[in-house]
Each structure stands twice: as structure tokens, then as C-alpha cells.
Amino acid sequence: MKYLLAALLTLSFYSMADDELQKEGNWFFKSQVNKMTDSTDVVAINGSKDVYTKRGLERNTSLVLRCNENQTDAYLSIYDYLGSGSPRITVRYDGGKPKKSIWQGGEGGNSAFAPNAVSFIKELAKHKTAVIGFEPYGSTMQAVEFDLSGVDVMAKKIAEACNWKL
């Protein structure tokens, strides 16, 4: 009976479709073949454990890396409104010196896209943690920390899907 159970578990593991949600380190990711282009799309999401409260509501923040239709994106997704412009984002890796830059605001005002996603992902892959600071509309600076464990695997998957070297 033990062998039958082990065989069934092994078969179910090998038959798992690429397009199912999977986990690597602190990242949840999904890969699937785009039916329109036959290219592989990959999306990886890392949710920060840091939460802030605004107007009585808890606000969550996620870091998203993706290859979609051969385009690489890296962005901060916020359960809040950042404004309609280009948000100023501060990133601090592994307790090092914080670096400020201007990111591109996403449609709807609840996300901010890194100006050079490939460089940003390559930099993430060198570190264990990242603290990202941002100012939601009508609020003060919020800083959230991301445990980047598994980011090297995510970076490799995205680089392969979008045809760039890590």
C-alpha cells in the first residue's frame, strides 16, 4: 500500500501542469504558454509581511516580477492609491544604503513599475532582503520588507522566458 501511495504521489507530481500556481522560497509563481504567441509567460509574486493601516484598513504590498508576451516587468503592487504621477520609490538591499528613484505609475494608481525591470531583477537576485519605501497619496512614507529567498530561481525563469541573460 505504501508503494502504491508513493507511486501515485510521484505520478501526480510529474503530471502537474506548468500553469498551476507553485511556490519557490518566498515567491508564488505561475508559468504558462501564451496561446496567441506560443511564448512562455511567467509571473512571480512576493507578498511583504509588513502591513500598514490607513483609514482603519490594513494595506498589503506585493512585489511582482513577470515576463508577459516577451516583455519583462517588475512592479510594486499596493492595496492603496499612490497617485496619478510617477512615484518616488526608495530601495534598500540587505541593510545597505537606500537608493531613491522615480518609477512609472501603473494604471489605476495602485502600482509602480521599476524603470529598468531587467536591471532591477538582476539586482534583486544578488540579495536576501529588500526594504521598499513609498508614499501613498495623502500619507507618509511607508517601508515594507521583502524576504527575497528564491528570487534567484524566479529571475532565471523570467530571464529564460523573456530571452535575456542573468
Identify the function of each model-found stretch.
Residues 3-14:
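Sec-dependent N-terminal signal peptides
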Residues 17-166:
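A generic "folded-domain core" signal
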